[in-house]
Amino acid sequence: MKILIAISSKEYSESTLDVGMNIARVLKASTTIVDVGQKISEFSMKDVSLANELMETWDIDRPGVDVLEWAFGYLLKNKFIEQRTTSDEFPKNLLIENDSGRAEVLLKGSAVENLSLILRNGDIIKELRDEVDAYEYDLTIIGGSAKRSMSHDMIQYINSSIFVVNNFNKTINYKILLAVDDSPGTKKAVKYGVRVAQAFGIKVQIITVNEDDNSNKANKKSSENASKMMRRCGVEAET
């Protein structure tokens, strides 16, 4: 399984990263953390000699590198990665760019086996969509945006399951609201619901929305199956 965690800033992405990495730990998933920095003009591209160079040779950091530095420090502090040397600085010299402008550094994870930080620049929705399409992620974890239209667009246009972390607070006792029906995606939603509940030790509320009597019967069966799965996995659930 492959997870993509999208972060945007040091100020607002800590809960997204925390929730995402704890989910990744439980799922034992290959995980990529991405920041989409502001678009780089052609003038700036020439200025910092971006094409096919190592970060240590750049005169100027490209937009977004500071966010990756923060994410690296967070991962190290919370023991999600192993310290490579006596230095705990972000290894800019290992951040290498490909022809499309996507820069990546591979890390040795202690919580998950395959972990990397990547940087893309441009329109956030387009870049995330391109990343998901090119590398076939199963789950994308994003923060709740102050612009509701942006979160809506991400859910609509990104071709993977979406988990939105909105104003997460560790001191609050949350529940998962799991909507099920007879659609093909329900089994995957139930599986993710179980894993997230296990990651945070929280309850699940299972709901269905019936359009007519026929859907009522099918959805009731889906709800019963979801409840059985929760019990089997030791997750407390209500319907």
Model-derived features with residue positions:
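Small/aliphatic-rich secondary-structure junction motif
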Residues: 1-66, 76, 83, 175-239
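Gly/Ser-rich helix-loop-strand patches that form or flank binding pockets
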Residues: 11-19, 24-26, 117-171
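Short hydrophobic/aromatic-rich motifs at helix boundaries and adjacent loops
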Residues: 40-45, 96-101, 162-165, 197-198
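Short secondary-structure capping/turn micro-motifs that flank functional sites
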Residues: 40-41, 91-92, 148, 171, ...
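Generic detector of short, locally flexible boundary/turn motifs and exposed helical patches
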Residues: 48-50, 81-82, 103-108, 128-130, ...
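Structural beta-alpha unit
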Residues: 58, 73-140, 232-239
